[in-house]
Regions:
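Long, low-complexity, charge-biased intrinsically disordered regions
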Residues: 1-159
Length: 159
């Protein structure tokens, strides 16, 4: 028995029929830093800005796939041709449960925010800002795995 010796081991577990390979490193998704959330809370308190959250409905379904993805249909809707060969589905967009869907949604949201004139912060890759002057500042922080975004703006958009 070796007392005081720590042995570190790694285990890579993949589920849903997916095998770990080199492309599995693309399954990450960026998350906003907790300190950044605290800074957004402080800014909104100091300047009486509105701080709210945005939940994107069915967000992952808006992201385009970056590779060909074929899926077996669920048992309740499977169809067969005349030679008893099963039909498969060719996916055009990401779906929930796809290993890369959160990363693809993060890339899609990044493109849309840049198109809308936001600039990505250098200190946190999940935070985008848009400002002309101090009264029209708009800060957007994205937290992809939870599919939640934080918005910090000078006025309450709801009145």
């Amino acid at each position: 028995m070796n007392l005081g010796v720590y042995v570190k081991t790694k285990c890579r577990i993949c589920f849903g029929g997916h095998r770990y390979d080199t492309s599995s490193s693309d399954t990450f998704a960026p998350t906003v830093n907790f300190c950044t959330v605290l800074i957004m809370i402080c800014l909104s308190a100091m300047f009486s800005w509105y701080l709210g959250s945005v939940d994107y409905s069915q967000a992952y379904l808006n992201a385009e796939l970056d590779e060909i993805c074929i899926m077996q249909a669920p048992a309740s809707v499977r169809e067969y041709d005349e030679t008893n060969q099963e039909y498969f589905w060719l996916l055009k967009k990401a779906i929930y449960g796809h290993p890369k869907s959160s990363r693809l949604w993060a890339a899609c949201l990044h493109r849309k925010l840049i198109e809308m004139g936001y600039e990505q912060f250098l200190t946190d890759q999940c935070v985008y800002g848009k400002w002309k002057n101090w009264d029209t500042t708009n800060i957007h922080g994205q937290n992809v795995p939870e599919n939640m975004s934080f918005v910090c703006i000078p006025t309450n958009p709801f009145g």
